[in-house]
Amino acid sequence: MEVKVRQAPATPSQIARDLRQSEGGRLLYVVPRLTPALRAAAEHGLAVVAVEEGVVMVEGHEYRPLAAVATTPSVPKSSRRMPWGRFALLRVLCRTREPRTQAQLAEEAGITQAAVSQSLSKLSRLVVRGSNGWSAANGDDLARRFLSEYPGAGGIGVSWFALDSVNAQADKALKAGLNENAILSGDVGADRIAPWRIPAKAIIYASAGLDLAKVGFARSTDERATLEVRVPADPTLWSTANAYAGDRRPRVADPLMVAHDILRTGGADAGDAVAHVLKQLTREWDAG
């Protein structure tokens, strides 16, 4: 098999030329991400590994190999650095209206104090500086800012299916992922924060891949999946979950991550489910 590594996705003309030159042999592209042209070419003899997305395409079939899941979260290689720290700061500022020092915010967000200082300067009127530290001018505004700008946790996801209730599946996956710091998000996370609708899909963030086949799950397509395990590129998820959990071991991601994942997975009443999570967050923020 001939392997071609490209720093940018190939154009349709480059793909056609490389396929001709391979003269019927197997050709493998290693690229940062998939494009429509690469997906189409994967139907006709081209194999593709999209490194940033953790996706392999062979003969038109898409795979997200469990073996490709890193043992620790890592930021995807990109020409543009993702501001994970700024998004984490937005989330922890929404936790309470009580002022906190930059050192306290840095600990909660899992970033450096210098990164906090830089991010606060960019938030302008959304934050207020007082004698005891920094706080959000309005928690709702920060929440909207996060939900409108956050691109997702990235990393590599593996889809699973089981016949148990989604809540039961989530508990089983949490137990299996105890050593990988598994936490809940999406529908099931919302059910633990502000119960409102029956969860349709569980999202689990873990620091390493989980082989859930050992506990009764089957690998699945994204469309049929009842549970997704994701090793995120965003390294701040555990810090913000810890901040919201207080002295307890976190079982659920922070509320804004949960709200984001509800919107990501969708559903006819996703907007209402998010509203219930944010309403609970607002109550806690107002209570200080």
Give, region by region, the residue ranges found by the protein language model.
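Short gly/ser-rich loop at a beta-strand->alpha-helix junction or flexible surface loop bordering the NTP-binding
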Residues: 154-236, 241
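Charged, structured surface patches that assemble and position nucleic-acid processing machinery
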Residues: 42-59
